[in-house]
């Protein structure tokens, strides 16, 4: 008998159907060991040696798996192919006393081909990944265990601070400060509604842009009225008509981050809900008539890379369903973001023959909606570009120049499969302009001045915050949903519609951390820590170094905060400072 251990029963059920009777597939239910719940569990003086204990609720699981492993001729550890998965396998190896009688297997998708290929090419646990996870866990424990009690003494209540959550909270607080301190400024625009003298009744808009070649600024009504007076009674003449063909590029396939962003924007799903459903699609579901199958590849990835086999299948599907003109001459290849680990493919369907429509009656509503989003995004990523006829017209009135732009789609390309985002759609057919010639005179229908005011920066949504966290290198895409969930749970932030706002408690916590622990809330510092963890994983850097570099100065700040800390209630001054 051979034993395969995975994290979840759903994943076990999917894998079991692909292996023969010689295999037993069982689940650990995630981590079986961790640092102790009621003690720090780290010997700082002994090079940050961690003390791992088996979760009380996992004692029976460990006993069961240990019994099976003793009977097995071979044990395969098949946890997820990332830091956390590697750490789970390492803890299982130690808790079960496997010594060298194990193999580590990984797959990017749970399919018969992928599982059997992994069985045929077993490896061993990658200690660089384990050490990166250990370093992160110890860092987070040190910060949480030592800093949270300080917050509780300073501010009433059971509070927590975290290495990543606090930096994310500060971004939200800072944006709220920007909005509250924003002073709107008046400005004006002037729009001419024009049409041809003959041959067309189309009225189109042109916006005043410059005077004597310099961009014009109209700060008030007086300046605007003066310009309107100068424009009176003068001809509107076409100075130039510039036509061009422009292209709309298809979007890349999803990464963990972009899936969460798009699911929030298009489906209105919270990031934690998106990840829960995506996990179900990855691990496998019982589908009527199909059995227990997985639908998408591994969902924790920052890569847009796709296998040659999957790319070829996408191109074949496009040709069959939409015609050859929707297939570009060469496959679309996308560059992954800077600092992406690129260990896994992008998120994509495992089997393109399982279309969303064919599964609609077999999936729950949100499972169907998310699968449809992933399926269509992947297919569109290999489709041809959208094509537009664009026209830019400059119209003169004396020294003044007006601009009018129009864009008409001539080939829908990828947009036939995957609807463009609202901001892209806004640019299409934005002004219907009749055929015009240089030097042609136009008739003015009306001249419309409009008072406007500058707007404050927008509040973050879950989608825009996740994008910012990724751009700044705060956390990893796989942790973004957890970061947000923690901030909600601690009542540091709240939602107003789709917008994120800090609570008074969140503001107060940030003010205190800025004063005594600025590194913890500094985005650049947090990003450098993430880079250090990446170096442990990718280059085998010494994992103790990042802890030795971080902890001594952090401990001094803890001592400083405690030395001047006699319990004080939150004061009006604290709240006022948070709003400055």
Where is each model-derived feature located?
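Short helix-coil junctions and helix-kink-helix linkers
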Residues: 260-270, 467-476
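C-terminal or mid-to-C-terminal helical accessory/interaction module adjacent to the motor/catalytic core
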Residues: 114-187
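Basic, low-complexity terminal or inter-domain segments flanking catalytic cores
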Residues: 2, 14, 23, 148, ...
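Positively charged, low-complexity/disordered segments
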Residues: 572-574, 578-580
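C-terminal helical "lid" subdomain and adjoining coupling/linker elements of P-loop NTPases
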Residues: 154, 175-219, 266
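Metal- or metallocofactor-binding catalytic centers and their adjacent structured scaffolds
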Residues: 217-252
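Intrinsically disordered, low-complexity regulatory segments
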Residues: 1-137, 146
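Core structural elements
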Residues: 136-145, 249-256, 276-290, 334-352, ...
